Amino acid sequence: YSNLNKDTLLIHFITNLVTEDYLDEMVATFNKAQKLAFVIASQFSAWQAPLPTRLHFENNFVLFHFSGEDGYYLTWIPDEVSNIVEKYIDSHTELKQLKLAYALLEAASNLYGLYSFTQLQRVYEVYLNKSYSLLDIQKWLKQIELVNPEMTNFRVFNGLIASKGLEFEEDEYHYFVKDAKYYMPDTTQEILSYQELIYGIDDEAEIKFMNWLEQNILKDNHFEAEVTSLSSEILTMMKHAMTYDMVQDVLQSLVQDGILRKRVEFTAENVVKPIYMKMRNWIYHGYTFEEYMDLMDKDEHEQRNNVIDLKQYRK
């Protein structure tokens, strides 16, 4: 070791000390919230960022932290062992399940916008193959809050889970989810894709929309609106829109405000409308507009078939 400098020596010791046995011993000392923080810290390390959390960990060779603001610790996993940790988590039954459960929660929040604890139970039963009681769901959400309530893409309100991008009034929440029929993707892979697809459209559609907006935004508009921020606002609005007419009205108001070119009412028909029709919509609980209309037609047809024909009954 005499020929190694301090940095190289440290890397050598860390990578040789962090074995599967060492990780087993370390994880065995964690409570449930710390295990979740460990899983999320691993994800943050892939983004080259520390995890802000109020949870404290005893000194070890995997999780390092220093004090941040407002009582938070900035916790990170060194690059030298991040791959080792990621592989360990994916091979560890409990940690792997925590990772999937958290990913499903984020994905469901992006897909539905607003949903009940009961729907989260169903998501876990179908895609995690695990049954949770409502009390289990409450405890799970509390554990996430212990890690860091600010890092989530959702918030909990009166027994409901709402995306932080949701723009409904809180007093409308329970009315909105009453008798809701939620879209359930065919595969685990599909629902997990919505963890990244926050607007409910694929990357190709989002790029197409961004290109359209860049061509139609007035560069010298008085509101100093830019493509990135404006696209986020419009796409979020579209997830709340009951019909495409509502989208048209918003685009027209942006024209009147001098933000978009006048031609958008024509070009949007070929670009924005098809995107809206295929968008996973919060108004329709994750269904697209077309899917939900088909669902309503099917329900109406079934109700008509269930009506008793009194004349036939008497016969």
Where are these regions (language model features)?
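A short acidic, leucine-rich amphipathic alpha-helix
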Residues: 38, 119-124
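C-terminal helical accessory/scaffold domains
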Residues: 143, 158, 163-244
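Short capping segments at the starts of secondary-structure elements
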Residues: 44-49, 110-118, 220-225, 240
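Short hydrophobic short-linear motifs embedded
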Residues: 304-314
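Charge-enriched amphipathic alpha-helical scaffolds
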Residues: 9-10, 53-62, 127-157, 242-278
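Positively charged, polyanion-binding regions of nucleic-acid-associated proteins
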Residues: 20-21, 94-116
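Basic helix-extension-helix modules of the SAP/HeH family
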Residues: 1-76
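Charged low-complexity interaction tracts in eukaryotic proteins
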Residues: 25-29, 71-84, 96, 139-186
